[in-house]
Amino acid sequence: MTDGSSLEFRQGPISQSTGTISPAQFRHTISAFHCEVIHRGVRRLPCDNKATVTNATIEALLGRRSIRKFKDEAIDDDTRATLETVAQHAASSQFLNDWSAIRITDPAIKAKLAEFGHQPYIATAPLLYVFVIDEHRNARIAERKGIDPASDEFHLKYSYRFTQAQNDAVLALHAMETAAYSLGLGCVILGSLLNNIPGLIDVLNLPEYTYPVLGLAIGKPDQNPTVKPRMPRTMQFFENTYPADADGVLDQLPAFDEEVHRYYDLRQADRPVDAFSDQVATISRQDVSHQTLLDKAAAQGFRLDQ
Protein backbone atom coordinates (compact mmCIF):
# COMPACT_ATOMS: atom_id res chain seq x y z
CA MET A 1 0.00 0.00 0.00
CA THR A 2 1.14 3.56 -0.68
CA ASP A 3 1.14 4.64 2.97
CA GLY A 4 3.66 1.97 3.90
CA SER A 5 1.19 -0.09 5.90
CA SER A 6 0.66 -3.76 5.28
CA LEU A 7 -2.50 -5.31 3.92
CA GLU A 8 -2.86 -9.05 4.30
CA PHE A 9 -5.76 -11.36 3.50
CA ARG A 10 -6.04 -14.59 5.40
CA GLN A 11 -8.19 -17.57 4.66
CA GLY A 12 -6.80 -19.82 7.36
CA PRO A 13 -7.52 -19.98 11.08
CA ILE A 14 -7.02 -16.66 12.82
CA SER A 15 -4.06 -16.88 15.20
CA GLN A 16 -4.25 -15.24 18.62
CA SER A 17 -1.29 -14.64 20.89
CA THR A 18 -2.81 -17.34 23.08
CA GLY A 19 -3.04 -19.91 20.28
CA THR A 20 -5.04 -20.76 17.17
CA ILE A 21 -8.82 -20.73 17.11
CA SER A 22 -10.60 -24.05 16.96
CA PRO A 23 -11.95 -25.53 13.71
CA ALA A 24 -15.49 -24.84 14.94
CA GLN A 25 -14.65 -21.18 15.50
CA PHE A 26 -13.05 -20.98 12.09
CA ARG A 27 -16.05 -22.50 10.33
CA HIS A 28 -18.36 -20.09 12.14
CA THR A 29 -16.15 -17.16 11.20
CA ILE A 30 -15.46 -18.09 7.60
CA SER A 31 -19.14 -18.67 6.90
CA ALA A 32 -19.84 -15.02 7.61
CA PHE A 33 -16.86 -13.40 5.90
CA HIS A 34 -14.00 -14.70 3.83
CA CYS A 35 -11.05 -12.67 4.89
CA GLU A 36 -9.57 -10.66 7.72
CA VAL A 37 -7.86 -7.36 7.08
CA ILE A 38 -4.56 -6.69 8.84
CA HIS A 39 -3.76 -2.97 8.71
CA ARG A 40 -0.87 -1.45 10.67
CA GLY A 41 -0.86 -4.58 12.81
CA VAL A 42 -4.49 -4.07 13.90
CA ARG A 43 -7.02 -6.74 13.03
CA ARG A 44 -10.35 -5.40 11.80
CA LEU A 45 -13.49 -7.17 10.73
CA PRO A 46 -15.51 -5.92 7.73
CA CYS A 47 -18.15 -3.34 8.61
CA ASP A 48 -20.18 -0.60 6.99
CA ASN A 49 -18.64 2.20 9.06
CA LYS A 50 -15.86 3.31 6.74
CA ALA A 51 -13.46 6.17 7.45
CA THR A 52 -12.72 7.69 4.05
CA VAL A 53 -10.35 10.35 5.41
CA THR A 54 -7.43 9.16 7.49
CA ASN A 55 -4.22 10.13 9.23
CA ALA A 56 -2.16 8.74 12.09
CA THR A 57 -4.54 10.06 14.76
CA ILE A 58 -7.60 8.60 13.05
CA GLU A 59 -5.81 5.28 12.58
CA ALA A 60 -4.99 5.17 16.30
CA LEU A 61 -8.62 5.86 17.21
CA LEU A 62 -10.07 3.39 14.71
CA GLY A 63 -7.68 0.74 15.98
CA ARG A 64 -8.73 1.23 19.58
CA ARG A 65 -9.37 -2.03 21.44
CA SER A 66 -8.93 -3.07 25.04
CA ILE A 67 -5.64 -4.82 25.81
CA ARG A 68 -5.76 -7.04 28.88
CA LYS A 69 -2.41 -8.78 28.59
CA PHE A 70 0.81 -6.78 28.76
CA LYS A 71 4.46 -7.66 28.30
CA ASP A 72 6.52 -7.60 31.47
CA GLU A 73 8.31 -4.44 30.38
CA ALA A 74 8.33 -1.09 32.16
CA ILE A 75 7.23 2.12 30.46
CA ASP A 76 10.10 4.61 30.45
CA ASP A 77 9.84 7.86 32.39
CA ASP A 78 9.82 10.10 29.31
CA THR A 79 6.86 8.24 27.84
CA ARG A 80 5.03 8.33 31.15
CA ALA A 81 5.62 12.07 31.52
CA THR A 82 4.39 12.64 27.97
CA LEU A 83 1.20 10.67 28.58
CA GLU A 84 0.52 12.63 31.76
CA THR A 85 1.13 15.95 29.99
CA VAL A 86 -1.24 14.96 27.18
CA ALA A 87 -3.95 14.20 29.75
CA GLN A 88 -3.47 17.66 31.24
CA HIS A 89 -4.18 19.20 27.83
CA ALA A 90 -7.66 17.72 27.56
CA ALA A 91 -10.62 20.10 27.73
CA SER A 92 -11.55 21.32 31.22
CA SER A 93 -14.91 22.90 32.05
CA GLN A 94 -14.34 26.55 33.02
CA PHE A 95 -10.64 25.67 33.39
CA LEU A 96 -11.24 24.35 36.89
CA ASN A 97 -8.81 21.45 36.42
CA ASP A 98 -11.08 19.54 38.76
CA TRP A 99 -9.63 16.08 38.32
CA SER A 100 -6.49 14.28 39.41
CA ALA A 101 -4.91 10.93 38.55
CA ILE A 102 -3.17 8.68 41.04
CA ARG A 103 -0.42 6.47 39.62
CA ILE A 104 -0.29 3.15 41.43
CA THR A 105 3.18 1.66 41.89
CA ASP A 106 2.80 -0.11 45.24
CA PRO A 107 2.32 -3.86 44.53
CA ALA A 108 0.08 -4.21 47.58
CA ILE A 109 -2.27 -1.49 46.34
CA LYS A 110 -2.22 -2.96 42.82
CA ALA A 111 -3.21 -6.32 44.28
CA LYS A 112 -6.04 -4.70 46.19
CA LEU A 113 -7.34 -2.97 43.05
CA ALA A 114 -7.16 -6.28 41.18
CA GLU A 115 -9.29 -7.75 43.95
CA PHE A 116 -11.83 -4.92 43.67
CA GLY A 117 -12.02 -5.30 39.90
CA HIS A 118 -11.94 -9.12 39.86
CA GLN A 119 -9.26 -8.84 37.16
CA PRO A 120 -5.82 -10.30 38.01
CA TYR A 121 -4.02 -8.44 35.20
CA ILE A 122 -4.58 -5.15 37.05
CA ALA A 123 -1.93 -6.25 39.56
CA THR A 124 0.75 -6.57 36.88
CA ALA A 125 -0.05 -3.59 34.64
CA PRO A 126 3.18 -1.67 33.90
CA LEU A 127 1.34 1.66 34.25
CA LEU A 128 -1.79 1.96 36.35
CA TYR A 129 -3.79 5.11 37.08
CA VAL A 130 -7.00 5.91 38.91
CA PHE A 131 -8.64 9.14 37.73
CA VAL A 132 -10.68 10.99 40.34
CA ILE A 133 -12.94 13.99 40.63
CA ASP A 134 -10.90 16.50 42.59
CA GLU A 135 -12.65 19.47 44.15
CA HIS A 136 -10.51 19.02 47.27
CA ARG A 137 -7.70 21.02 45.68
CA ASN A 138 -10.11 23.74 44.58
CA ALA A 139 -11.71 23.80 48.04
CA ARG A 140 -8.31 24.56 49.56
CA ILE A 141 -7.72 27.28 46.95
CA ALA A 142 -11.16 28.80 47.62
CA GLU A 143 -10.48 28.67 51.36
CA ARG A 144 -7.37 30.79 50.84
CA LYS A 145 -9.63 33.34 49.17
CA GLY A 146 -11.92 33.49 52.19
CA ILE A 147 -14.60 31.01 51.06
CA ASP A 148 -15.67 28.35 53.57
CA PRO A 149 -16.04 25.01 51.72
CA ALA A 150 -18.50 23.84 54.38
CA SER A 151 -20.84 26.76 53.64
CA ASP A 152 -23.61 26.95 51.05
CA GLU A 153 -21.48 29.57 49.29
CA PHE A 154 -19.12 26.83 48.10
CA HIS A 155 -20.83 25.48 44.97
CA LEU A 156 -18.18 23.02 43.78
CA LYS A 157 -19.75 20.28 45.91
CA TYR A 158 -23.12 20.34 44.13
CA SER A 159 -24.39 18.00 41.42
CA TYR A 160 -23.66 20.23 38.40
CA ARG A 161 -19.99 20.62 39.30
CA PHE A 162 -19.74 16.94 40.21
CA THR A 163 -20.90 15.88 36.75
CA GLN A 164 -18.67 18.44 35.03
CA ALA A 165 -15.65 17.24 37.00
CA GLN A 166 -16.52 13.65 36.14
CA ASN A 167 -16.67 14.60 32.45
CA ASP A 168 -13.29 16.33 32.70
CA ALA A 169 -11.71 13.25 34.29
CA VAL A 170 -13.03 11.03 31.50
CA LEU A 171 -11.78 13.44 28.83
CA ALA A 172 -8.31 13.46 30.41
CA LEU A 173 -8.25 9.68 30.63
CA HIS A 174 -9.31 9.34 27.00
CA ALA A 175 -6.60 11.77 25.89
CA MET A 176 -3.99 9.70 27.73
CA GLU A 177 -5.38 6.48 26.27
CA THR A 178 -5.33 7.85 22.70
CA ALA A 179 -1.76 9.08 23.11
CA ALA A 180 -0.73 5.68 24.44
CA TYR A 181 -2.27 3.90 21.46
CA SER A 182 -0.54 6.30 19.08
CA LEU A 183 2.79 5.24 20.63
CA GLY A 184 2.06 1.57 20.04
CA LEU A 185 1.06 0.87 23.63
CA GLY A 186 -2.10 -0.91 24.74
CA CYS A 187 -4.67 0.12 27.34
CA VAL A 188 -7.77 -1.03 29.12
CA ILE A 189 -10.20 1.27 30.93
CA LEU A 190 -11.11 -0.08 34.36
CA GLY A 191 -14.68 0.68 35.30
CA SER A 192 -14.58 -2.50 37.37
CA LEU A 193 -12.66 -0.67 40.11
CA LEU A 194 -15.96 0.96 41.03
CA ASN A 195 -17.24 -2.42 42.24
CA ASN A 196 -16.01 -1.33 45.67
CA ILE A 197 -16.10 2.45 45.87
CA PRO A 198 -15.74 2.69 49.68
CA GLY A 199 -12.78 0.30 49.53
CA LEU A 200 -11.22 2.27 46.68
CA ILE A 201 -11.64 5.54 48.55
CA ASP A 202 -10.03 3.98 51.61
CA VAL A 203 -7.04 2.35 49.91
CA LEU A 204 -6.28 5.51 47.90
CA ASN A 205 -6.78 7.73 50.95
CA LEU A 206 -9.13 10.01 49.00
CA PRO A 207 -9.99 13.16 50.98
CA GLU A 208 -13.24 15.12 51.12
CA TYR A 209 -14.52 16.45 47.78
CA THR A 210 -12.82 13.72 45.75
CA TYR A 211 -14.43 10.72 44.09
CA PRO A 212 -13.09 7.87 41.90
CA VAL A 213 -14.14 7.85 38.24
CA LEU A 214 -12.20 5.24 36.25
CA GLY A 215 -8.92 3.38 36.16
CA LEU A 216 -6.55 3.03 33.21
CA ALA A 217 -3.97 0.28 32.72
CA ILE A 218 -1.24 0.83 30.11
CA GLY A 219 1.55 -1.37 28.79
CA LYS A 220 3.15 -2.98 25.77
CA PRO A 221 0.55 -5.32 24.24
CA ASP A 222 1.05 -9.05 24.56
CA GLN A 223 -2.12 -9.92 22.63
CA ASN A 224 -3.74 -8.79 19.39
CA PRO A 225 -7.54 -8.85 19.73
CA THR A 226 -9.80 -7.95 16.85
CA VAL A 227 -11.41 -4.52 16.99
CA LYS A 228 -15.01 -4.89 18.16
CA PRO A 229 -17.77 -4.21 15.64
CA ARG A 230 -19.36 -0.79 15.87
CA MET A 231 -23.00 0.11 15.55
CA PRO A 232 -24.07 1.44 12.12
CA ARG A 233 -23.78 5.21 12.13
CA THR A 234 -27.46 5.60 11.20
CA MET A 235 -28.39 3.99 14.51
CA GLN A 236 -26.30 6.42 16.53
CA PHE A 237 -25.98 9.69 14.61
CA PHE A 238 -29.07 11.81 13.92
CA GLU A 239 -29.67 15.22 12.39
CA ASN A 240 -31.23 18.14 14.25
CA THR A 241 -33.69 16.10 16.36
CA TYR A 242 -34.07 12.61 17.74
CA PRO A 243 -35.91 10.42 15.21
CA ALA A 244 -39.64 10.09 15.83
CA ASP A 245 -39.63 6.62 14.31
CA ALA A 246 -37.89 4.59 16.99
CA ASP A 247 -38.43 1.36 15.07
CA GLY A 248 -36.82 2.88 11.99
CA VAL A 249 -33.65 3.53 13.98
CA LEU A 250 -33.48 -0.20 14.65
CA ASP A 251 -33.86 -1.30 11.01
CA GLN A 252 -30.22 -2.36 10.90
CA LEU A 253 -30.27 -4.06 14.31
CA PRO A 254 -30.57 -7.64 12.97
CA ALA A 255 -27.48 -7.20 10.79
CA PHE A 256 -25.57 -5.62 13.69
CA ASP A 257 -26.66 -8.45 16.00
CA GLU A 258 -25.23 -10.95 13.53
CA GLU A 259 -21.98 -9.02 13.16
CA VAL A 260 -21.50 -8.80 16.93
CA HIS A 261 -22.31 -12.49 17.30
CA ARG A 262 -19.46 -13.32 14.90
CA TYR A 263 -16.95 -11.54 17.16
CA TYR A 264 -14.68 -13.59 19.42
CA ASP A 265 -13.51 -12.03 22.69
CA LEU A 266 -10.10 -13.28 23.85
CA ARG A 267 -11.50 -13.61 27.36
CA GLN A 268 -13.82 -16.37 26.05
CA ALA A 269 -12.03 -17.43 22.89
CA ASP A 270 -13.93 -20.71 22.55
CA ARG A 271 -17.28 -19.10 21.76
CA PRO A 272 -18.64 -16.05 19.91
CA VAL A 273 -20.12 -13.27 22.02
CA ASP A 274 -23.87 -12.88 22.35
CA ALA A 275 -25.76 -10.74 19.87
CA PHE A 276 -25.93 -7.06 20.83
CA SER A 277 -29.68 -7.27 21.56
CA ASP A 278 -29.09 -10.20 23.90
CA GLN A 279 -26.33 -8.32 25.71
CA VAL A 280 -28.60 -5.31 26.22
CA ALA A 281 -31.40 -7.51 27.54
CA THR A 282 -29.07 -9.31 29.94
CA ILE A 283 -27.46 -6.16 31.31
CA SER A 284 -30.81 -4.38 31.63
CA ARG A 285 -31.87 -7.05 34.14
CA GLN A 286 -28.72 -6.88 36.25
CA ASP A 287 -29.41 -5.60 39.76
CA VAL A 288 -27.17 -2.60 40.42
CA SER A 289 -29.23 -1.21 43.29
CA HIS A 290 -26.20 -1.72 45.55
CA GLN A 291 -24.20 0.70 43.36
CA THR A 292 -26.00 3.77 44.66
CA LEU A 293 -24.17 7.03 44.10
CA LEU A 294 -25.83 9.55 46.42
CA ASP A 295 -24.73 8.05 49.73
CA LYS A 296 -21.16 7.33 48.62
CA ALA A 297 -20.75 10.82 47.16
CA ALA A 298 -22.31 12.36 50.28
CA ALA A 299 -19.72 10.57 52.40
CA GLN A 300 -17.10 12.47 50.38
CA GLY A 301 -18.79 15.82 51.01
CA PHE A 302 -20.75 16.15 47.76
CA ARG A 303 -24.43 17.14 47.75
CA LEU A 304 -25.85 15.62 44.60
CA ASP A 305 -29.43 16.37 45.59
CA GLN A 306 -28.74 20.03 44.81
Question: Predicted regions span which residues?
Answer:
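Short, low-complexity, intrinsically disordered N-terminal modules
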Residues: D3-S6, Q11, T20, S31
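Intrinsically disordered, low-complexity segments enriched in serine/proline and basic residues
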Residues: G4, S15-Q16, R43
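N-terminal cationic leader/targeting segments used for protein routing and processing
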Residues: S15-S17, S22, K50-A51
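Acidic, surface-exposed loops and disordered segments
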Residues: F26, I30-Q306
